[in-house]
């Protein structure tokens, strides 16, 4: 690979790792199980109904649950969408 100055770039060194992050839902006293599970099902891709319910129960029992992990840009999108539906969200955790 050659940059615009004609310098040869080592492809092993020029690949930037995309930052990853975790999306975490927190327990609260006003969202119902049904609402939390429905939000997870409609917003998080490939979320099964069973997984949505399992995560919803985990949020209630332990106070929080990681509902998605992946690239930072997607994490920000899912975080914002879940927050806009009224879910209580932890700050995005970069990993």
PLM-predicted stretches and their roles:
Residues 1-95:
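Terminal domain-initiation and capping elements
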